Each structure stands twice: as structure tokens, then as C-alpha cells.
Swiss-Prot record:
Cell wall formation. It is an enzyme of class 6 (ligase). This is D-alanine--D-alanine ligase. Binds 2 magnesium or manganese ions per subunit. It catalyses: 2 D-alanine + ATP = D-alanyl-D-alanine + ADP + phosphate + H(+). One of its GO terms (biological process) is regulation of cell shape.
Length: 348
């Protein structure tokens, strides 16, 4: 039987491009090469599409995907040239211009099946403020917050923050992930610096109440019939789970499954599945919770293209459920084809 083509898109224009490369390299090594052949395209910081490597068999352990430092610009293509009949695209892209609906819309115009959420759910989940408002309507508990938009009266918003919240608070760009641009503030001076940082990444910013809590994550897989994993816990050796702690310094470990009461496990899985449905999720997501010292459970965010490295929480959660990394990839390809068929059938 002829192999099916799996196309990996990686890199991208967002600040999370390095995570994307790590995730794509993990996928490239884990693919079942009896079933798939792999073709890769690097998207540069400027948005150029570069044809990079092809694999018919599992690459060597030291094989690296080409990046800005190693790509051959003579291999630059028109973005639409990635089209191949029968291929499925795995957009292993994180952050803006990757998991915000942009690339998903492009792939739908090309009439190509792709792994993950569609335009609407990607866009909704990428924006933290919009996500909170959707989840509020679904009755899912979240930490108190204040939303800011560039151009609003900053002094008035700082006053609102200090009236509604108590220090410490966390300031986040609304449209970023992987803890990029997020910082903790213990006083107004630090808050002002945090707002300056967050507004460098987005014109919409979220300030959330800091809570003393454990960070618990649940994996989601499916389209209409979504399944969830047992929760896993992020165990940190740092005060704040930032980008460097996650991907560079290796200062975190995972406890899978998390050691939490059964009733909390049930609530988290129920809320994760409800959030996925409320946002119109497809394929995969990772739902992140705060489990506070007083027993309260808050949904923090739903990540529609979670980190996919071999040490990332999402594939490890499914491995704990008995679904291996290669089988997880194969399942995601099947879900992509199912979603594509339904999407095309709706175009009457």
C-alpha cells in the first residue's frame, strides 16, 4: 500500500518559533514510516515558505530540521505550492500566525485536511480575553481578571485593577502562548512594567489575580466525540513557569497522573471537555487548570496546539492513557481527515 504524505509546517512568524521546531523534530522522529512519508516546510520569521527535508524512513537521532541559520533560500516556494493531493498537513506552529486561525484558513482555501482546530476555534482559544468570555457563558470558573485594550485610559485601568484584584497579579498578552510576554507583579511599579512588556506583544492585555495553586493539565482528543486524559501536574523548581523554564532551562518535571482527589479529577475532565465543545474544538487541545490551596478549580486556558515535543505534557498524558506517540499522530491524522470530509460536505 502506498504511503500517505504527512506535511509538517514548522517555524513561523511568532515568538514561539523555537518551540515549533522542537515539536516538529519530535513528530518527524515519532511518525510511523510504514504508514507515512514526511515532507517538511519551514516558515521564516518574515513569512516565507521554504521547502526543507523529506523523509521516507525514520531519520537519524541527530538529524535536525533546517531553520533560519541553515535553510537554503533557493528552496523558497509560493505558499500554495505545499498542496499535494491526498496529503494531510500537521501545522506544528505555536502562537500568532500559527494557531490563531491564520494558517487554518489558508489550508482550508487550499482544500487540504489539517491536524487540529479550525479557524473559529483556533482564533477564539488563542485570544485569552475572548476565551474567558466564552467560558464564562458556559459557567466554567476562572480567576478574576481585568481586560485592557491599547488606547484605553491607562491610569483608569490601573485603578480598576487595584480595586478588583490584589497583588500579586499576572499580566499576559491576550494573543500569545508558551508564557511569552507574561510577568508577575507585586506592586504598581511592577504592574506598569508588566503592562509595557505585554503591550509589546499584543494590543489586548489581560491582568489576572494571582492565586496560590498547583498547575494541572488535561489532554483532549477528538472531534464531536471528545475524550480527555487523566490530569498531569507541572512540578516546578522555579517561582514562575515561564518560557525559559518550559523549554530552555528544563526546570520543570511532570507528575502523571497528578495526585489529586478523584472528585477534582472528574471536575477537571468534565470542564475540559465542556470548554473544548464551547469553543468548537477539533482534533486536539490541552486544557490548563489552577487547583487552588482552598480546593477551588479554575480553568486557566485551552491550548489548541500544545507543545508536541517528546517531553511535552500533551503526548505524555496520552501515553499514560495507553496511546503511544506514533499512534497519537496517526489518530490525529484520522481526525483531520474526518473534519475535512465534514467541512467539505457542508459546502452545498
Amino acid at each position: 500500500m502506498a504511503k500517505q504524505r504527512l506535511i509538517l509546517l514548522y517555524g513561523g512568524r511568532s515568538a514561539e518559533r523555537e518551540v515549533s521546531v522542537l515539536s516538529a523534530e519530535s513528530v518527524m522522529r515519532a511518525v510511523n514510516y510504514d504508514r507515512f512519508s514526511v515532507k517538511t516546510y519551514f516558515i521564516t520569521k518574515d513569512g516565507d515558505f521554504i521547502q526543507t527535508q523529506e523523509f521516507e524512513a525514520k531519520p537519524a537521532a541527530d538529524e535536525k530540521l533546517m531553520t533560519n541559520a541553515t535553510v537554503d533560500m533557493s528552496q523558497k516556494i509560493k505558499p500554495s505550492d505545499i498542496y499535494e493531493d491526498g496529503a494531510v498537513v500537521f501545522p506544528v506552529l505555536h502562537g500568532p500566525m500559527g494557531e490563531d486561525g491564520s494558517i487554518q484558513g489558508f489550508l482550508e482555501v487550499l482544500k487540504m485536511p489539517y491536524v487540529g482546530c479550525n479557524i473559529l476555534s483556533s482564533g477564539l482559544a488563542m485570544d485569552k480575553i475572548t476565551t474567558k468570555r466564552v467560558l464564562e457563558s458556559a459557567g466554567i470558573a476562572q480567576v478574576p481578571y481585568v481586560a485592557l485594550v491599547d488606547g484605553e485610559d491607562l491610569e483608569q485601568k490601573i485603578q480598576e485593577i487595584e480595586e478588583k484584584l490584589t497583588y500579586p497579579v499576572f499580566t499576559k498578552p491576550s494573543n500569545m502562548g508558551s508564557s511569552v510576554g507574561i510577568s508577575k507583579s507585586e506592586n504598581q511599579a511592577e504592574l506598569r512594567a508588566s503592562l509595557d512588556l505585554a503591550f509589546k506583544y499584543d494590543s489586548r492585555v489581560l491582568v489576572e489575580q494571582g492565586v496560590t495553586a498547583r498547575e494541572i493539565e488535561v489532554g483532549l482528543l477528538g472531534n464531536v466525540d471528545v475524550k480527555s486524559t487523566l490530569p498531569g501536574e507541572v512540578v516546578k523548581d522555579v517561582a514562575f513557569y515561564d518560557y525559559e523554564a518550559k523549554y530552555i532551562d528544563n526546570k520543570i518535571t511532570m507528575d502523571i497522573p497528578a495526585k489529586i482527589p478523584e472528585e477534582v479529577v472528574s471536575l477537571m475532565r468534565q470542564n475540559a471537555e465542556a470548554a473544548f465543545r464551547a469553543l468548537g474544538g477539533l482534533g486536539l487541545s490541552r486544557c490548563d487548570f489552577f487547583y487552588a490551596e482552598d480546593g477551588q478549580v479554575f480553568l486557566n486556558e485551552l491550548n489548541t496546539m500544545p507543545g508536541f515535543t517528546q517531553w511535552s505534557m500533551y503526548p505524555l498524558l496520552w501515553e499514560n492513557m495507553g496511546l503511544s506517540y506514533p499512534d497519537l499522530i496517526e489518530k490525529l491524522v484520522g481526525l483531520a481527515e474526518e473534519a475535512f470530509a465534514k467541512r467539505e460536505a457542508h459546502l452545498l
